């Protein structure tokens, strides 16, 4: 099967056996394009403390290569993390080269613990898992089957929402594939949990995954076992240092439950509208591709772009199991804009049909 780098989110038993970015190296026992069974033979434990904490100093750290790239490589200097590093919700990192075994390795120590980045090592969508083509000639933008993406940036753009990421990819003159039914160039998706939360109002206020998924215990410490906030509202959303603050929202458990239910109902409404207008655009694009109708080129291109963005948006949010809770206002704003684009582009295209 290959692509054994996926196993890095299941265990850290063999983390020191890979060269940085999983590149093949004569002294490194493993590489990211090794067969899965070869890597599995080196595994005895699931991921554990050392995934997020340095075993020598207990400092918060990152060991996932692709996230280190996104937070430190010059290719990413114009994207959200590096532009905001040092601000609330964007802790600085110290990248440490660890190549004492004869091949390059890196870790990154967080200036301040922030679970969005510690959990985000796995709960992110990085470019390494996708194949990119150039608009100019439809050829690969990187060497074929290059597991380490030689000459290609493998991190995440830290885009806070699908509109932002779609624009980044398309402005770079890239796409990931072609939708066969419509002929539309697509921008594929991964699970952008970290990117969504980091760019949300909660994330920018310094709230992290563990604030909601590690309930606060009676002694003031957090549980170290993830759970759904909805199972423990009293110790998550409605606790005194969050929305239960007597000088702030002062939510009760019932109010927290009601707010989450409201957000998720709004999500379902927007989801239905996205699918309705996406279906209308798709049907028209199929007719145009099959030659049943002819649309003026400017309107045809806008319709293709609107549908491509719709596909990216659907993939982005449908892989976020919170149903809008991770970024309520961001989801509503984004989905509303995508729906408006679909409606406008579809109507304009229909008006030019010959």
Model-based region annotation:
Residues 1-5, 12-14, 41, 46:
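Long, charge-dense tracts
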Residues 6-10, 17-22:
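Glycine-rich active-site/cofactor-binding loop and its immediate structural neighborhood
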Residues 10-11, 54:
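Short loop/turn segments at strand-loop or loop-helix junctions that form parts
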Residues 18-211, 215-352:
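Primarily the internal scaffold of c-type cytochrome electron-transfer domains
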